[in-house]
A protein has these predicted regions:
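Acidic, mature catalytic/reactive cores of soluble proteins
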Residues: 2-663
Length: 663
């Protein structure tokens, strides 16, 4: 619980924002620590909310839509929604159990109020009762504030962000609220317009509520929408509980696993099946620096790793939806045709710099789009083939045209594997011969032979292994980051999942080098050395979880458990992670919430439980082999449980807009 003063205009105290000067010389408020954000969403849109319940990012219609709130990227013109007590307050928050519905509790000297934030979603009326992919969602952010004890004055402030701040907001009155160019704000109480801003003060006594809805500007507004919010909340809660109730994992750290699974599901875009890397753009990897990227896109590699994590928990619909998305993105000479796509399957992701925005804490530029879509990364072919192997072995299908495309892709890899690329980390430097990329080319051909039921690539695979052994291993026996370099790369910690043949002792030597060069008490750096960009980034959360995999594989079970516990302690108060963590301060860095961080947590927790019950021999084989074994073990364990699992009736999470009078 943290203590704060009340909002602007509160009596009996002074409100002082911390201030610093950006590199441009402009004053700006000290930004909300990324660690202090929670997230709500509905598999279409997403919102980031601070500990004090201020909405600082909100994209309503889709993840990549122009946000109506983006204060975290510019505290002057970015837009926000703020409702907080007028008196000094203490605040605590949590997610409602097994949901992505956020509850924030304000406590003042005079009373207590509970804030509920959610974005409505549920089962589509035409979907089957067990279909958790075909969804109905409303492009709304709903906030319900209920005084539970005593009384409280709540101050409401909203500034809409329009067109990334390039347009002056226009505000006009409508029934029950105001229309903003780009959105509407409905409110159960009177609010005032002050130029582009909306404000009001509401006095609540115990049992009374303040109800707010921020909705996309194109939405028709039903007359009684504010009276329907409790029904929408019930449906949304039921959906999330029903979805997470299908999770097969019941082992240690189940709460952390379920929270990570809920985060991954929230980052799926239901209309197409795409999975985004994170919910935001341009949250910096270096505070005040230029390592600021747009992650509201679907990286093929990150998505397939997310689906490994969801598959091991027993989910099958999301992988099938992504398979359709991926093959629909284009069937060129090779598959996939690029490493990242837009959430609607867009190929052109031209990177633009929004130079008029201050950036998070003065971190410029703010970027929209991502130039990585033009990069050549050889590891992606192995990641896709590896996942498709698992997908088919768990009952998924591959049509003949898709198999033919995979054959062409394997032929391409067999011909071009010896060429340089940008690597797993998308370095914006000259292409290099990344060792992990070479190993993943071997994985691509190995898994292709399984999928195609052939042995056509044995000879080139032997050549790949010889080349990695000759040029990819340093004199001290560890895997290099690149040929002709003695640097080490933390992505090598994923080697145990590849089944790539290495000389005896190579993996242990690699772990030792990573421990010596990249590990800190808070986490693991990706790499050291020049990558074509300025500044030193933080430790990478996913790498921290990968370390325990390598430790387990080399028989260090106790050390792996201790390291996993260390990584769990790095989560924020609601169990979420950004991309990176500052090694000294513990401050979150990078976009939020980060899919790669959460899928790595799931992988680590399941792996620890897997080894505990199956012994170290279960770690042999490929990533797909491990997942299949883990799924079988979970199914057997759950069948042995005598207590039936509580279920949510499918009718509880049916979102029928017509029946609710919202269609």
């Amino acid at each position: 619980m943290c203590s704060c003063d009340g909002g602007p205009g509160a009596a009996g105290f002074a409100w002082h924002w911390g201030r610093h000067v950006t590199p441009s010389g402009r004053d700006t408020e000290t930004p909300t620590d990324i660690r202090d954000y929670a997230v709500v969403g509905n598999c279409h849109g997403i919102a980031l909310i601070s500990k004090e319940a201020r909405v600082e990012w909100c994209a309503l219609e889709s993840f990549d839509a122009s946000p109506v709130c983006f204060r975290m990227l510019d505290d002057e013109i970015g837009g926000y929604l703020d409702t907080r007590p007028m008196q000094p307050f203490e605040v605590a928050r949590r997610y409602l159990p097994k949901t992505n519905v956020l509850e924030t509790t304000f406590t003042t000297a005079s009373g207590t109020a509970r804030v509920i934030d959610f974005m409505p979603l549920g089962r589509h009326p035409d979907a089957a009762p067990d279909d958790f992919v075909r969804l109905q969602a409303l492009p709304w952010l709903v906030r319900i504030i209920r005084a539970t004890e005593g009384e409280m004055d709540i101050r409401l402030d909203m500034l809409p962000g329009v067109g990334w701040g390039t347009c002056e907001p226009e505000v006009r009155r409508i029934d029950h609220g105001v229309a903003l160019n780009g959105a509407s704000l409905l409110c159960s109480h009177a609010i005032e317009i002050h130029g582009a801003r909306v404000s009001g003060v509401v006095h609540l006594r115990a049992g009374e509520q303040l109800r707010l809805v921020v909705m996309a500007g194109h939405c028709a507004i039903p007359a009684d929408v504010l009276s329907r919010l409790d029904q929408l909340l019930d449906i949304t809660v039921a959906y999330w509980k029903a979805w997470i109730g299908r999770c097969g994992y019941k082992g240690p750290h189940v709460d952390a696993v379920e929270r990570s699974a809920l985060a991954l599901k929230l980052l799926t875009y239901a209309p197409t099946g795409a999975i985004i890397a994170a919910g935001t753009t341009s949250l910096p990897e270096v505070l005040g620096g230029s390592r600021n990227w747009d992650y509201r896109l679907s990286w093929v590699r990150d998505s397939t790793l997310s689906l490994f994590a969801l598959s091991v928990l027993g989910y099958r619909e999301e992988p099938e939806a992504f398979r359709k998305f991926l093959f629909n993105c284009g069937t060129g000479a090779v598959f996939p045709t690029q490493i990242v796509y837009g959430i609607h399957g867009e190929h052109d992701l031209t990177e633009r710099e929004l130079t008029h925005l201050r950036g998070y804490g003065g971190s410029r530029p703010v970027r929209v789009g991502n130039a990585a879509h033009r990069q050549r990364q050889f590891d992606v072919y192995g990641e896709v083939m590896d996942w498709l192997t698992l997908h088919r072995e768990l009952g998924g299908s591959l049509r003949p045209p898709e198999l033919e495309l995979l054959r062409r892709t394997a032929d391409y890899v067999a011909e071009h594997w010896c060429e340089p690329g940008q690597g797993f980390w998308e370095e914006r430097d000259e292409p290099q011969h990344f060792v992990y990329g070479k190993m993943m080319c071997w994985v691509a051909l190995d898994r292709a032979q399984v999928l195609l039921q052939c042995r056509d690539y044995d000879a080139v695979m032997r050549t790949m292994v010889e080349d990695v052994h000759r040029r990819g291993i340093a004199p001290r026996g560890y895997l290099r980051k690149c040929y002709d370099s003695d640097l080490v790369d933390a992505v090598a910690l994923r080697t145990p999942t590849l089944d790539f043949p290495l000389p005896p002792g190579c993996l242990q030597a690699t772990i030792d080098e990573v421990m010596d060069k990249l590990v800190t008490p808070r986490g693991v750096y990706r790499y050291k050395g020049s990558d074509g960009l300025d500044g030193d980034e933080g430790t990478f959360v996913a790498c921290g979880f990968w370390l325990l995999d390598a430790l387990l594989f080399t028989g260090k079970k106790l050390q792996a458990q201790e390291w996993f516990d260390t990584m769990l302690r790095q989560a924020n108060d609601v169990g979420l992670y950004a991309e990176e963590i500052d090694a000294e301060s513990g401050r979150f860095l990078g976009n939020f919430p980060q899919a790669l961080s959460h899928l790595a947590l799931i992988h680590g927790a399941v792996l620890l439980d897997f080894v505990e019950h199956g012994g170290p021999e279960v770690l042999q084989g490929t990533h797909a082999d491990r997942v299949q074994h883990a799924v079988r073990m979970m199914e057997e364990a759950n069948r042995a449980r005598q207590a039936p699992q509580a279920e949510v009736d499918a009718g509880d999470w049916l979102l029928d807009l017509a029946a609710l009078g919202l269609g």
